[in-house]
Amino acid sequence: MEAEKSKQNPGKKPVEATMEHVLVALRETKEKREIRIQKLFEFFDNSKLGFLDDTQIEKGLSSLSIPPKYRYASDFLKVCDSNRDGRVDYQEFRRYMDAKELELYKIFQAIDIEHNGDICPAELWEALDKAGIKIKDEELASFMEHVDKDNNGIITFEEWRDFLLLNPHEATIENIYHHWERVCLIDIGEQAVIPDGISAHAQRSKLLLAGGIAGAVSRTATAPLDRLKVALQVQRTNLGVVPTIKKIWREDKLLGFFRGNGLNVAKVAPESAIKFAAYEMLKPIIGGADGDIGTSGRLLAGGLAGAVAQTAIYPMDLVKTRLQTFVSEVGTPKLWKLTKDIWIQEGPRAFYRGLCPSLIGIIPYAGIDLAAYETLKDLSRAHFLHDTAEPGPLIQLGCGMTSGALGASCVYPLQVIRTRMQADSSKTSMGQEFLKTLRGEGLKGFYRGIFPNFFKVIPSASISYLVYEAMKKNLALD
């Protein structure tokens, strides 16, 4: 029998895999395998309906500790439901099991370079390394521990199958790594902090590229609102929204609404890269020896990483504000000349004017955003989903927009002070600017430009989300 031959010749490359090889690797007869698959189907079909729908699959996966947030249930239904009737009967379930076990056997054989019927840590590490995935020794040990149920230091095909059988995604080493990250390693429900696991992965550059393009498109689309917001923030009179729009149009026509957008877009990539790098450096410091930093640790690490990134790119932000608030009868100034004038006339410290209120607002914003996001998600589960499933992407997007708007509102006075300090060439301190605004304009002075800021939230978040998802598909990150 070919299956036996391939098993008995460790150094020989196996022939094309078949279900016969799968049965031999599992030490299982066709009858026993049929009974096992039938029992698994009945486990999901606990209502004895004879078919599986999205709710049954969701409940079954949840009972197996597979978080609903990763939409495995809908993906599983989509893969199994060959006739597209919205349910999975036993024959469809059976066909999925045949295809999945054969697929898992093929990649198991590819990783098992010794062809001795098991995967050792060195073989798993080599497979991950070839796929461009760099993981630490402790992460590799954790990977082995989660799959190796009998803790004998190797992974058999049965253990491999049990770990991956219900993962509906294609069995590539990259997808298997993602599955382990999601199910066993991390829980990335937070929106205001950097998720664990991303920076250790070789595809981080692709994720940063996708996020960078999404940010660039989003910022360009909402640039007129940003220009209007900044123009209103630096005003000390009640000029109003419409007169300000007319003033911008009168000075530079349509291009006036996009003044400073080039710098705003240019900030995206370096800011994201620095934030990820700083987060990775801070994680072991905050988490200690075990590396588990928890939600509060991630919030702190994310906030500090954001502060590092903000400090690094802050001169670009200040020059952007100067460009947007520059008033001249000869038109828009040249970027290089404006930067040179700041350096010569005000000195290098001027490029960090307003940094203090900017940094003060980072962690409060992230904390309010996170708390509001989780609260809104819980409310949506309780009132709309009746605790049956995790909110889908549209609900999560809505929760994110609302929580982001709330967080921004709470720290908005700091943003106004920062913008005014950036635009002002005099050496006014944060305290002096605060008192000047309070005495001259009252509390409403701290909220100038907040309405354009609100109106930015929905289009900005929606465009970012749609472009990011499209880029993930194009870059094969799903």
Swiss-Prot record:
GO biological process: ADP transport; AMP transport; ATP transport; calcium ion transmembrane transport; phosphate ion transmembrane transport
Topology Mitochondrial matrix: residue spans: 226-259, 317-353, 415-448
Residues on Mitochondrial intermembrane side: 1-207, 280-302, 374-396, 469-478
InterPro entries tied to this protein: EF-hand-dom_pair (IPR011992), EF_Hand_1_Ca_BS (IPR018247), EF_hand_dom (IPR002048), Mit_carrier (IPR002067), Mitochondrial_sb/sol_carrier (IPR018108), Mt_carrier_dom_sf (IPR023395)
Solcar repeats (start-end): 202-285, 293-379, 391-474
Membrane topology: Multi-pass membrane protein
Annotated residues for binding of Ca(2+) 2: D148, D150, N152, E159
Activation and inhibition: Counter-exchange transport activity is saturable and inhibited by pyridoxal-5'-phosphate, EDTA and EGTA. Activated by calcium Ca(2+) and manganese Mn(2+) ions, and slightly by iron Fe(2+) and zinc Zn(2+) ions. Repressed by copper ions Cu(2+) and slightly by magnesium Mg(2+) ions. Magnesium Mg(2+) ions promotes slightly ATP uptake, ATP-Mg(2+) being exchanged with ATP(4-).
Stretches assigned to the EF-hand domain: 32-67, 68-103, 104-134, 135-170
Taxonomic superkingdom: Eukaryota
Keywords noted in UniProt: Calcium, Membrane, Metal-binding, Mitochondrion, Mitochondrion inner membrane, Repeat, Transmembrane, Transmembrane helix, Transport
Record field: transmembrane: 208-225, 260-279, 303-316, 354-373, 397-414, 449-468
Family in the record: Belongs to the mitochondrial carrier (TC 2.A.29) family.
Domain notes: The N-terminal domain can bind calcium.
Chain's role: Calcium-dependent mitochondrial carrier protein that catalyzes the import of ATP co-transported with metal divalent cations across the mitochondrial inner membrane in exchange for phosphate (Pi). Can transport phosphate, AMP, ADP, ATP, adenosine 5'-phosphosulfate and, to a lesser extent, other nucleotides. Binds calcium ions Ca(2+). Mediates also calcium uptake.
Protein name: Calcium-dependent mitochondrial ATP-magnesium/phosphate carrier protein 1
Annotated source species: Arabidopsis thaliana
Species classification: Eukaryota, Viridiplantae, Streptophyta, Embryophyta, Tracheophyta
